[in-house]
């Protein structure tokens, strides 16, 4: 067994440590008897964790055979399965790329989903991949309210904030075509290194700024802090100190290796966000296993002792300790579940590997050109409706104008035709923008749509 093949070592260690009872000690003392958590819920969560782990292990084996093209896994982050259970699938989720367990657990909420097969199609770049058509490995599902995201550099954070902001705005404007309920919240997960990106900082600031002024931004930010961004360590306490006293936020720290603590803290976060309609920041301390991806040789920047110490803190081993201590499962039960999950994943992945790939230009373009359902657009406003909006400017619509004025007219037409369109930003409301591109929109369409 090669010291560089950490996936194989972690796999073998799991079986060995469970058999011998050599399991890591709890980082916090939180007895199951002091909670209302059902043992069956712990078992379900553990199964999702194990399935996610085996998807990672299988992906690396298939890569060696030329059948898999993506090996950034979720190993070490399997505690996020809890978020897939506590938050209903009706809450939209913008997910980090290590969300395998969350995706699998969330799928249990709706019948007819096939999370393992969908992930396998994505791993193998199959044209049948239901969310990206084999173009990119992302977590996504329309049925589960998970818009697909390339989340590596937190580009999804501003989008998540925008959705959270839109929930009550859509209600107040009586927009009928809505995906989310009035009491929905939005989930947005990311890694610890991602919070330093300007896109993320803009999203965090917007959520806090709106909340500070009395607005509602019902969003749960989930920072899955494994302490390292690819090879660069995150400074100690940087995440906590950046958010623990951030205006407008409720900060909740939890142990990402402890299912019991995760469940209790997730319930607290869900209740606070849903009731107060304001941002919550969950700081989930966890670990990363098997490096950043299959191509990452972790021994190039971590000592062997450090790697092995981290591997012994495997969240699956922590879950085993909890299950055995609380007599939810025996060691034999756990090992049987682990091997059964391996067989399931092997079968699903081998089946997915046989599905069609993107072989022609037509295959590549199909997701753009395919007409899968009839689309309808709002009726073009009539002349009287336009005159009511433009007023005295109606007479100038056919005359030559400079670009800023033409953009202004275009925005008025768009907002008249599409009642779900908003314009918001610095100086765009009453002032109408520094160059008057948004002039008069505030008076034409009101402060709920232009702000």
For each feature predicted by the language model, list its residue ranges.
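Long, amphipathic alpha-helical stalk/connector segments used for oligomerization, subunit docking
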Residues: 271-276
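Conserved thiamine diphosphate
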Residues: 171, 178-182, 235-268, 311-340
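Short glycine-rich or small-residue beta-strand-to-loop segments that form or flank ligand, phosphate
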Residues: 69-70, 187-191, 253, 421-427, ...
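Conserved acidic/glycine
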Residues: 1-80, 86-87, 290-445
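Flexible loop/turn segments at secondary-structure boundaries
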Residues: 79, 100-104, 195-197, 227-231, ...
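Cofactor-binding active-site loop characterized by glycine-rich and histidine/acidic residues
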Residues: 54-57, 61-219, 229-249
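Short glycine-enriched loops at secondary-structure junctions
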Residues: 126, 225-227, 235-237, 286-288, ...
């Amino acid at each position: 067994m090669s010291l560089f093949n950490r996936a194989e070592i972690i796999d073998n260690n799991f079986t060995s440590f469970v058999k011998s009872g050599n399991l890591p000690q709890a980082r916090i003392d939180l007895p199951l008897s002091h909670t209302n958590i059902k043992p069956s819920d712990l078992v379900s969560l553990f199964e999702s964790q194990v399935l996610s782990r085996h998807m990672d292990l299988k992906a690396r084996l298939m890569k060696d055979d030329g059948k898999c093209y993506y090996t950034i896994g979720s190993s070490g982050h399997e505690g996020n399965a809890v978020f897939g259970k506590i938050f209903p699938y009706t809450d939209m989720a913008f997910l980090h790329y290590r969300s395998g367990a969350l995706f699998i657990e969330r799928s249990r909420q709706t019948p007819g989903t096939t999370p393992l097969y969908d992930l396998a199609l994505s791993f193998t770049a199959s044209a049948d991949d239901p969310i990206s058509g084999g173009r990119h490995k992302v977590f996504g599902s329309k049925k589960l309210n998970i818009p697909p995201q390339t989340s590596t550099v937190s580009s999804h954070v501003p989008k998540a904030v925008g959705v959270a902001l839109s929930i009550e705005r859509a209600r107040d404007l009586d927009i009928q075509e809505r995906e989310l309920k009035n009491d929905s919240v939005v989930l947005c997960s990311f890694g610890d290194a991602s919070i330093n990106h300007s896109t993320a900082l803009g999203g965090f600031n917007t959520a806090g700024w709106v909340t500070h002024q009395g607005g509602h931004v019902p969003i749960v930010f989930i920072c899955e802090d494994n302490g390292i961004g690819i090879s660069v360590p995150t400074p100690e306490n940087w995440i906590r100190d950046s958010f623990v006293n951030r205006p407008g936020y409720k900060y909740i720290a939890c142990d990402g290796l402890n299912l019991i603590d995760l469940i209790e803290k997730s319930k607290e976060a869900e209740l606070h966000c849903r009731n107060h309609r304001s941002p919550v920041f969950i700081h989930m301390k966890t670990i990363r296993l098997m490096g950043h991806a299959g191509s990452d040789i972790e021994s190039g920047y971590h000592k062997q002792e450090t790697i092995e110490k981290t591997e012994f803190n495997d969240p699956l081993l922590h879950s085993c300790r909890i299950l055995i201590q609380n007599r939810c499962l025996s060691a034999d039960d756990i090992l049987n579940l682990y091997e059964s999950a391996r067989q399931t994943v092997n079968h699903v992945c081998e089946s997915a590997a046989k599905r069609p790939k993107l072989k022609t230009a037509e295959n590549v373009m199909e997701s753009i050109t395919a007409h899968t359902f009839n689309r309808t657009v709002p009726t073009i406003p009539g002349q009287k409706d336009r005159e009511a909006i433009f007023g005295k400017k109606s007479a100038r619509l056919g005359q030559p104008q400079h670009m800023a004025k033409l953009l202004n007219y275009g925005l008025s037409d768009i907002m008249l035709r599409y009642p779900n369109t908003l314009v918001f930003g610095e100086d765009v409301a009453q002032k109408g923008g520094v160059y008057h591109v948004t002039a008069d929109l505030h008076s034409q369409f009101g402060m709920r749509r232009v702000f």
